[in-house]
Amino acid sequence: MAVTKKRKEKKNVYEGNVYIQATFNNTIITVTDLQGNALSWASSGGLGFNGAKKSTPFAAQTVAEAAVQKAQQCGLREVHVFVKGPGIGRESAIRMLGTMGLRVRSIRDITPIPHNGCRPRKTRRI
């Protein structure tokens, strides 16, 4: 019995969501369709940035560029942006989405804020 390779279907998606998770240590961007099925994703660690370089705005810009290039092969043109986390790569990633030719329909901050839940970690002293 011959083994046949299953061909991956090319999705044709015009509008989707971009989730930007910007932490103090890394930036992860996931591009989905409107139902939430992932089209592409990229992270600064996966693109070769190491250590403290992962959390820079340039790394976030590069991550956004890589994730959008993969998603544009599926025909993506308009996006809703959801930003989560306190990282410094937030603005540069959003700015890169516009320069890559995507039309940004909306931007929402979905950073989870506790209603006095867990005790926060100790403050940094530099």
Swiss-Prot record:
Swiss-Prot/TrEMBL GO biological process terms: translation
GO molecular function: rRNA binding; structural constituent of ribosome
Lineage, uppermost ranks: Bacteria, Pseudomonadati, Spirochaetota, Spirochaetia, Spirochaetales
Function: Located on the platform of the 30S subunit, it bridges several disparate RNA helices of the 16S rRNA. Forms part of the Shine-Dalgarno cleft in the 70S ribosome.
Assembly and binders: Part of the 30S ribosomal subunit. Interacts with proteins S7 and S18. Binds to IF-3.
Domain of life of the organism encoding this protein: Bacteria
UniProt xrefs under HAMAP family: Ribosomal_uS11 (MF_01310)
Name used for this protein in its record: Small ribosomal subunit protein uS11
Source species of the chain: Treponema pallidum (strain Nichols)
Keywords on record: Ribonucleoprotein, Ribosomal protein, RNA-binding, rRNA-binding
GO cellular component terms attached to this protein's record: ribonucleoprotein complex; ribosome
Protein family (similarity comment): Belongs to the universal ribosomal protein uS11 family.
SUPFAM superfamilies: Translational machinery components
